[in-house]
UniProtKB/Swiss-Prot annotation:
Residues 1-14 are cytoplasmic. The active site is at S154, D390, H393. Disulfide bonds join C79-C129, C100-C165, C109-C395, C318-C391. It comes from Arabidopsis thaliana (Mouse-ear cress). The gene is AXY4. Xyloglucan acetyltransferase that catalyzes the acetylation of fucosylated Gal residues on xyloglucan side chains. Predominantly catalyze 6-O-monoacetylation of Gal residues in the Fuc-Gal-Xyl trisaccharide side chains of xyloglucan oligomers. Involved in xyloglucan specific O-acetylation in roots and rosette leaves. This is Xyloglucan O-acetyltransferase 1. Contains 2 motifs that are conserved in esterases, but it is unlikely that this protein belongs to the catalytically active pectin esterases. Its EC number is 2.3.1.-. It is found in: Golgi apparatus membrane.
Length: 416
């Protein structure tokens, strides 16, 4: 190689470097604004979202879902939360008998001296998903500027008071209305979010008279709803319905103004018809009444008691301290739930309706009732031979808090 050729090599190298450097900005520009991988990435994400099967509940503390995912969530079935087990939860409840001021006296097991606390440290674990802890801020956001009404018997009140305790951890409710014996009609306001929460005592949902000193049986008109809540129906955005146990009492039934029959009517001159069909018709009448106007309806299924065949005043009734591990639904509990599920299925096409199916999970919690601690310090004067027990309602805090953890998921899906 001659001297001139050797001198030309650096020049050629400079030209090549210059050309390469000139093309780098152009390549970068094309990658940024015409990236051939961008469409592949977007398509992959969209396909993934389209094929997602919802297997877990979500909460505001989890990663925010995209709008595309939200749109699809509406069409996907929820994980079956009705099948599962109670597992230990070391975190415990969000409130206690001292921090919540709206607990009915008979359900404040802590203040009434219940000595064990293990019943507080369980959570419901569905077989195929997880239920997030109750998010009070999320609930209030979902119900902003809305009116939520609980309608039914003392189990509806039990669930309501659980909800108030959960919400009061972030915002104090103001009692703005109360009426009736034992404050059976009450209304609260959460000014922070303009949320109204009400409870209406209506143990049959339909019109009727409750037994009293002058009446030894209930009277039900099963073809029209109870006006005590029916007259306020247009004020409600969301309704939670919960009844059942009052239908077991003696009653005379009317339909279209005529006597239909009765249940346990030893002194009445009418036909014994039982209560199952009447319970069904009462649920049906109610769901027809609340249909329309975009109103959201949640039907809470039958909540089992745990007297286990023992008298209500027997010593040791519902004195369990742990959940059952394998008890199955049967008898009354199974039949009442079956009726509610069937009526829910029939009405779902006409009503914006969800069923809060708590029967199976609740039958596993004999430890969650007040028992003798429905009254304060029941053994302060020793152990009596007979003592009143509440094996129906739930201690607060207690298993009923789980019902509201599931309910918030229903509200979230409605708001998507």
């Amino acid at each position: 190689m001659g001297l001139n050729e050797q001198q030309n090599v650096p020049s050629q190298r400079k030209i090549i470097v210059f050309i390469v450097l000139a093309f780098i900005p152009i390549a970068l520009f094309r990658l940024c604004f015409n990236n051939p991988f961008s469409s592949i990435k977007d398509t992959s994400l969209q396909d993934s979202a389209a094929n997602v099967v919802i297997t877990s509940f979500s909460s505001s503390s989890q990663e925010e879902e995209s709008q595309e995912s939200f749109d699809h969530i509406q069409d996907e079935p929820l994980c079956d939360y009705t099948q599962g087990n109670w597992v230990r939860d070391e975190i415990g409840p969000l409130y206690n008998g001292s921090t919540c001021g709206t607990i009915k006296d008979g359900q404040n097991c802590f203040r009434h001296g219940r000595p064990d606390s293990g019943y507080l440290y369980w959570k419901w674990k569905p077989n195929e998903c997880d239920i997030p802890r109750f998010d009070s801020n999320r609930f209030l956001d979902l119900m902003r500027d809305k009116h939520l009404a609980f309608i039914g018997d003392s189990m509806a009140r039990n669930q309501l008071e659980s909800l108030l305790c959960l919400l009061s951890t972030v915002s104090s409710p103001d009692l703005v209305y109360r009426n009736g014996e034992d404050n059976k009609f009450r209304r609260w306001r959460f000014e922070s979010h303009n949320v109204t929460v009400s409870v209406y005592w209506s143990p049959f949902l339909v019109a009727g008279l409750e037994k009293s000193g002058n009446l030894d049986h209930n009277v039900l008109h099963i073809d029209r709803v109870d006006e005590r809540w029916g007259n306020d129906l247009e004020r409600f955005d969301t309704v939670v319905v919960s009844v059942g146990h009052w239908f077991l009492h003696p009653a005379v039934y009317y339909e279209s103004g005529s006597v239909l029959g009765c249940h346990s009517c030893e002194t009445s001159n009418c036909t014994e018809v039982g209560f199952y069909d009447v319970f069904r018709k009462a649920i049906r009448t109610t769901l027809r009444a609340v249909a329309g106007s975009g109103r959201e309806v949640i039907l809470t299924t039958f909540s089992p008691s745990h007297f286990e065949g023992r008298p209500w005043d027997s010593l040791g009734a519902c004195n369990m301290t742990k959940p059952y591990e394998g008890k199955v639904l049967e008898g009354l509990d199974l039949d009442m739930r079956k009726i509610e599920i069937e009526e829910y299925t029939a009405a779902a096409a006409e009503v914006r309706l969800e069923v809060l199916d708590v029967t199976a999970m609740s039958v596993l919690r004999p430890d969650g009732h007040p028992g003798p601690y429905m009254y304060a310090d029941p053994f302060k004067n020793g152990v009596p031979e007979r003592i009143p027990n509440d094996c129906l309602h739930w201690c607060l805090p207690g298993p009923v808090d789980t019902w509201n953890e599931i309910m918030i998921e229903m509200l979230r899906r409605w708001k998507v």
